[in-house]
Curated annotation (Swiss-Prot):
Classification via Pfam families: Ank (PF00023), Ank_2 (PF12796)
Encoding gene, per UniProt annotation: ANKRD30BL
Bias kind Polar residues: ranges: 218-232
Entries under Gene3D superfamilies matching the protein: Ankyrin repeat-containing domain
Keyword Repeat among UniProt keywords: yes
Superkingdom field: Eukaryota
Keyword tags: ANK repeat, Repeat
Annotated protein name in UniProt: Putative ankyrin repeat domain-containing protein 30B-like
Region (Disordered): 1-21, 216-258
PROSITE patterns to which the protein is assigned, alphabetical: ANK_REP_REGION, ANK_REPEAT
Length: 258
């Protein structure tokens, strides 16, 4: 088996548990030990980008492309998490299910965006993946795209009917999340798409206040005044949930070697 992250040793203190607030939007529950028995051959081949092996397996026998591993993940999930667009195309062309949910109600599209696999995400969107499913924290695919600061995917999702006003459990619409991320281009784009400029999160932070805060940071940055970036920041502007999806390196689950 392969250990994906160091587990606490008996007698030692493990990582500090996140507060309930930090769990409202995103979690980091993807670190675990994968046993050989957890994955079938189809999952291993998909995770490694072995399209040729999958095709050979499909020719030999009738396969259930949507069969899940012990944690409810399909071959398509594994291909997207590891960025194997060729395998994603193969599975989609063979009519596998697109909107299979994992244990946290995340779609495969969300996972592709969380792992910053844009090519895989685009294939899913073009193939009709539902952009409006919410995970257990209330996030849609648009929240994930905004958090990854991927303007092109945000635009693509909206063009395919994604809801621009969904609030996650922290009270963040995609617009508020973009402001929290200081993603100026995405903020401006969402406003051109008539995102609600009066959206309020659970701390009652009015959007206009956050915009002014962002503009102050931008102005201070241009003036090369690092101390000024924190001046005039309302306490309410602190986000309810501090945790965001980790980088792709820590999110991609690796499979055991054969």
């Amino acid at each position: 088996m392969e250990r994906l992250s160091a587990a606490p040793v008996k007698g030692q203190t493990g990582p500090e548990r996140p507060s309930p607030f930090s769990q409202l939007v995103y979690t980091n529950n993807d670190s675990y030990v994968i046993h050989h028995g957890d994955l079938r051959k189809i999952h291993k081949a998909a995770s490694r980008g072995q399209a040729w092996k999958l095709e050979r397996m499909m020719k030999k026998t009738t396969m259930d492309l949507n069969i899940r591993d012990a944690k409810k993940r399909t071959a398509l999930y594994w291909a997207c998490a590891n960025g194997h667009a060729e395998v994603v195309t193969l599975l989609v062309d063979r009519k596998c299910q697109l909107d299979v949910l994992d244990g946290e109600n995340r779609t495969i599209l969300m996972k592709a965006l969380q792992c910053q696999r844009e090519a895989c995400a685009n294939i899913l969107i073009d193939s009709g993946a539902d952009p409006n499913i919410v995970d257990v924290y209330g996030n849609t695919a648009v929240h994930y795209a905004v958090n990854s600061e991927n303007l092109s995917v945000v635009a693509k999702l909206l063009s395919c009917g994604a809801d621009i006003e969904v609030k996650n459990k922290a009270g963040h619409t995609p617009l508020l999340l973009a402001i929290r991320k200081r993603s100026e281009e995405i903020v401006e784009f969402l406003l051109t798409k008539n995102a609600n400029a009066n959206a309020v999160d659970k701390f009652k932070c009015v959007h206009q206040q956050l915009l002014e805060y962002k503009q102050k940071i931008s102005k201070n940055s241009q003036n090369s005044n690092p101390e000024g970036t924190s001046e005039g920041t309302p306490d309410e502007a602190a986000p309810l949930a501090e945790r965001t999806p980790d980088t792709a390196e820590s999110l991609v689950e690796r499979t055991p070697d054969e």
